[in-house]
Regions:
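Aromatic-rich, lipid-facing transmembrane alpha helices and their immediate juxtamembrane interface loops
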Residues: 2-283
């Protein structure tokens, strides 16, 4: 990983990312109402109907990771998680919690009181706040397993990075009138751009692990968006996303998760190289 000078980040990447993320908000009014209460229900699971849905979701997500990663010791979680990823995870979680708070306040999405306990932290259900720590931890477990068993497929994948940037920027231009679509795309574009700037060698590995993550993401995100219940726990304002769903969740959620996870890994590498004695500043 090439570590750019602080001035490059300050004068190039940060303004570009801020403009991408912030421009759709200029003079834009969120359209009130229009929440999609029902998801595309695949099957009804009665035991999920109730205020413990989010808690069940977290337990089902965490227990397999705890068993395979910690009990069976599939990877060195003490170094991989506690030493390398814990601080970046917390930092990115705080950024995305702020995003969640803002969009909840603006009416981009809301939470169905029939499926939560009713205790809030900064106007978010406490279960939602926990999501930002539990789900990334579980997702990074998949990344670590792929890292150990698949030895960095596709390398830095620069061609793929450029192709994704072009395609996603085109989609961004077409969806600037939808706040969730625009911010999800702009966050993804910004993170891919940053991975190019720092010449991050782990992009191919991340893409491989993220593609695998889409499988459990369909199930666990579906639990929150009406795939297995009569109504959705997380209800989206239909005017603020593109209307395309994978199973029951908006496709924009993929960009949300992509930006969150790659941000953790980029920040982890940045901190690791900054603290090491052998990094090279690029002027």
């Amino acid at each position: 990983m090439r570590i750019p000078s602080i001035s490059k980040l300050v004068f190039y990447w940060i303004p570009a990312a801020a403009m991408l993320v912030g421009y759709p908000f200029i003079g834009y009014d969120i359209i009130a109402g229009g929440f999609e209460i029902h998801g595309d229900q695949l099957i009804s699971m009665q035991f999920l109907e109730g205020t413990y849905l989010y808690i069940i979701h977290h337990l089902l997500s965490f227990i397999p990771v705890f068993f395979f990663g910690i009990v069976l010791n599939w990877f060195d979680y003490r170094n991989a998680v506690w030493k390398e990823l814990l601080v970046p995870l917390v930092m990115m979680a705080l950024i995305f919690i702020a995003w969640d708070i803002l969009f909840t306040a603006l009416g981009v999405w809301r939470f169905n009181p029939a499926y939560i306990q009713g205790v809030s932290i900064i106007n978010l259900p406490w279960e939602e706040v926990c999501w930002f720590f539990i789900i990334p931890f579980c997702s990074l477990f998949v990344y670590q397993i792929v890292k150990i068993r698949w030895s960095n497929p596709w390398g830095s994948a620069r061609t793929l990075q450029f192709v994704l940037l072009v395609v996603l920027f085109g989609m961004y231009l077409l969806n600037m009138d939808r706040i969730y679509s625009a911010t999800s795309l702009s966050m993804t574009i910004s993170m891919i751009g940053l991975s190019l700037i720092v010449n991050w060698k782990g992009f191919g590995l991340f893409i491989a692990s993220f593609l695998l993550l889409l499988i459990p993401m369909g199930l666990f995100n579906g639990m929150l968006t009406g795939l297995l219940t009569k109504e959705a726990l997380v209800q989206y304002n239909s005017a603020e996303f593109g209307g395309i769903r994978i199973l029951s969740f908006p496709i924009e959620d993929i960009g949300f998760g992509f930006g969150f996870l790659i941000g953790i890994l980029l920040l982890s590498d940045f901190i690791k190289h900054r603290l090491s004695a052998d990094y090279t500043l690029t002027k």
